[in-house]
Amino acid sequence: MKKNNFIIMMASYVATIGVALAAEYFVSPTGNDEADGSVGRPWRTIQRAASAAIAGDVVTIRAGIYREWVKPANAGRADAPIVYRAEPGEKVVITGSDPITEWSRRSDGLWEKNIPYDTFGGLNPFTDFIQGAWFSPKGRNHFRTRLIQNGEPLELHGEDIYGKMTNGIPKIATGHAALIPGVVSGTIYAAFKSDPNVVVPELVVRPACFYALKTRRDYIVLRNIVFRNAGPQWGHPRGEQAGIVGSNWSRGWIIEDCEVSGSSCAGITLGKCANDFDAFWTDRKQSFGLWGKRLFERDLSEVGHHIVRRCRISDCGQAGICGAYGAAFSLVEDCEISYCHWKKPFEGAEMAGIKFHAPVDSIIRRNRIHHNGSLGGIWIDWMGQGTCIQDNVLWANQGHDIYLEVNHGPILFEGNDMLSKNSVWFRSNNVAIIGNRIYGNFTCDRDEDNGSRKTPTLYPHSMKIKELFVSTLPGNFIFINNLMPNKPYFGKSIEYPCRFEDNWYVPRDYWKIDDVKGTVAVNPPAGSKKPVFKRVDKERLGKTVLLDQEFPECSGSIAGEL
C-alpha cells in the first residue's frame, strides 16, 4: 500500500512539474526563426512555434499576415492542450495565398504572368484540380486555386478555354483569367478590373492554413485567428478530409472565435484520415462491406470530442464544416455559416453548411446557417445516433435546411427556426421534432431502390458497431409543440407510425420572413386555435424503434417560447 501511495504521489508531482514548465512562445512578422521565441525575441513563422510546442504550451501570435501552412508537430493533453492564439486585441491572418507582382500588359489588353512551379507551397495552381468520389465536375475541370483581386476571385479557365485561343492567347472577359500549364512553369492571362501592379492580386498556392500531416495531434486550441484562401482537395467520407483548418483524425480540438473563408472545398474538417483501404479520390462504388468492417475495427472512441464555437465560416466550395466519423461527441455552437457551395460550379454528395457522418451524441446549437447551396444547411448522413440539433436559425438556403440521410436516430430537433423554402428532408427514422418554427416544405422519401439501403447501428453513446446492416426505412417522427403551415403528409414512404401532438398550424400567408436578417414574424389569422402546449420530457418521447434507445435530453421547448 505504501508503495502504491508513493507511485501515485510521484505521478502527481511529475504532472504538476510538467504543467509548471509549460512555455509561452511568441511569433511576430518582424521576428526571426533563429531567435528563441521569447517575448523579446519572437519567431518569424508560426510553423517554427508549431514544431517546438508541446503539451501545455501557448503560442501567442502578434498582428500580421502569415503566408504559411502550419503543420502541428505535437499533441497536447486533455489537461494541458497546446494553444495557438492571437495576441489579445490584435488581428492575425494565416493565408494560403501569395501576392503575384510584376505583371506585363499585352497589346490586346490582357495581363500576363509566367510563374515557375518550384515557387509553390504544396499546391500547383496550374495542374491540381478538384476530384474524388461523390464528386460531379459538370463536364469541366475545377482548379483548387483561386486568383483574387481586391477580395474578389476571378472566374478561372483551363482546358475549356483552348477552343477560344488565337496564337496561343485566350479570349476572356473582364473578371476572368486563364491558367495555361507548361513543363516547368505556367502562365496566367487575366482580364483584371484594376491594374494588378497597383491593386496586387493573390494566388492560392497552399492546400491548407492549419492542418496536421500526422494523425492524433490531439488537444489543440485555435483562438481568435483568421484563416483564409487555401485549396484543399474534395473531402469525401471514405477518404482523407482536409480543409483550410483540419484535425486529421485527432481528438479534443477547440476552434473558437475564428474566421474561416475562401476554401476550394471544405472550411473546417473534423473527419477521416487517409488509409490504404480508403476509396481515396476514386470511384464511389467500392464495397462498403470490406471498407466499413476495417474502419470500425479501429478504436473510433479515441477521436472526436471537438468544439467549434463562435466562428464565422463562409465562401467554401464544398462545406463549411464537415466530418466523417471524427466529429462524434462534438459540439458546434454559436457559429455563422454562410455562402458555402453557393455558386454551385460543381455538384456532389458532400455539400452543406455542416455535413457530418456519425455525429454520435454531438450537439449542433445556436448557429446561424444561411445562403448555402444544393443540399442546404445541416446534412446528417449515417449513424446520427444521439445527435441534438437545437436553437439554430436556418434561412435562405437553396436546398433543405436540414437533411437526414439513412440514420436510425435517435435525433432531436428542438427550438429551431427553419425558414427556407424547403425545411426538412427525411430519409431516416426515429426523429423528435419539438418546439420548432418550421416555415418550408417537408420531404420524406425512401432512399435508393425503395429504401433497400442499410447502414450500421451503434451501441448507445459509443462508436462500437452493434449491427452492420440495418434498414433505414423512414418513420417514428414525433412532432410536438411546433409552429408549422400545415401538418406534413408523408404518404406511403413511412414504414413506422408517426405522432403529431399539440402543434399549431398557421398558413404561410401569415408568416413574414426576412431573408437578410434571418428573422420571422407570425401573425395568425383571427380565430386560429392555439393548442395548449405541454412540456416534453424523455418519458413522453419514449424509445426508438429498432434500437430501443432513449431520445437525447430535451429542454422541453414549446413553440410559444421561441
Task: Label the predicted regions.
Residues 6-7, 519:
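Short amphipathic alpha-helical "recognition" segments used for binding
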Residues 20-23:
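Boundary at the C-terminal end of the N-terminal hydrophobic targeting segment
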Residues 253-254:
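Mature catalytic domains of secreted/periplasmic carbohydrate-active enzymes
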Residues 1-5:
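Positively charged n-region of N-terminal signal peptides that target proteins for export
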Residues 26-249, 259-262, 269-298, 527-562:
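Extracellular polysaccharide-degrading/modifying enzymes targeting complex plant/algal/animal polysaccharides
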Residues 210, 232-248, 264-544, 548-550:
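Glycine- and acidic/polar-rich repeat regions and solenoidal domains
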Residues 9-18:
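Bacterial N-terminal signal peptides
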